[in-house]
Curated annotation (Swiss-Prot):
Gene (UniProt): pinQ
KW Iron (keyword) present: no
Family: Belongs to the site-specific recombinase resolvase family.
EC number: 3.1.22.-, 6.5.1.-
Cystine residue pairs: none
Domain Resolvase/invertase-type recombinase catalytic, chain residue ranges per copy: 3-143
Regions annotated as coiled coil: none
Name by which UniProt lists this protein: Serine recombinase PinQ
Catalytic residues (UniProt): S11
UniProt record, GO biological process: DNA integration; DNA recombination
PROSITE patterns: RECOMBINASES_2 (PS00398), RECOMBINASES_3 (PS51736)
Top-level division of the source organism's lineage: Bacteria
Keywords from the named record: DNA integration, DNA invertase, DNA recombination, DNA-binding, Hydrolase, Ligase
GO molecular function, one term: ligase activity
Length: 196
């Protein structure tokens, strides 16, 4: 027999889920208190990082219904929401969002709504990639170096090369510069074959 669950999330401890529970009740959903899952966690946490939501997922079975007051209860961004709804749909769980008129997100209308959300999620992802790429290009143009800082500066590399030419062992040079033999060998190789 299918059951109805509600997921109520609040961000801070000084808030309560009372308004969300009342809104669900006003929409005509009669939910047993033990089937209302309340969680005090930031909205920026992905659903996979929400212990209460994960406990809810373990209880939901095919044919059950999940009621949320707002779409953001199902994820931290459009991509996370889409993933969560898809996961619930694959399990056979109907998801109702009261902020969208109580629409069942697994119905044809709900699926269309999720396609719009998917498009927004893809747009969001593309914008993020574009901003990241342009930020990297801008930083490189400004001379910003990526990765770990070099162990040896150019002056030290030149000193290493001079010591190698004068016959000092790689191990002795590594000890002198307080670094590994491999670092000295890399510096030697770089100086022997300068960038073309």
């Amino acid at each position: 027999m299918s059951q109805i669950f509600a997921y109520c999330r609040i961000s801070t401890l000084d808030q309560t889920t009372e308004n969300q529970r009342r809104e669900i009740e006003s929409a005509g959903f009669k939910i047993k208190p033990q089937q209302i899952i309340e969680e005090h966690i930031s909205g920026s946490a992905a659903t996979s990082e929400r212990p209460g939501f994960n406990r809810l997922l373990a209880r939901l079975k095919c044919g059950d219904q999940l009621i949320v007051t707002k779409l953001d209860r199902l994820g931290c961004n459009a991509m996370d929401i889409r993933k969560t709804v898809e996961q619930l749909t694959e399990t056979g769980i109907r998801v109702h969002c009261l902020a969208l008129g109580g629409i069942d997100l697994t119905s044809p209308t709900g699926k269309m709504m999720m396609q719009v959300i998917s498009a927004v999620a893809e747009f969001e992802r593309d914008l993020l990639l574009e901003r990241t790429h342009s930020g990297i290009v801008r930083a490189r143009g400004a001379g910003k170096r990526f990765g770990r800082p070099p162990v040896l500066n150019e002056e030290q590399k030149q000193a290493v090369f001079e010591r190698i030419k004068s016959g000092v062992s790689i191990s002795a040079i590594a000890r002198e510069f307080k670094t590994s033999r491999q670092t000295i060998l890399r510096a030697k190789a770089k100086l022997q074959t300068p960038d073309i």
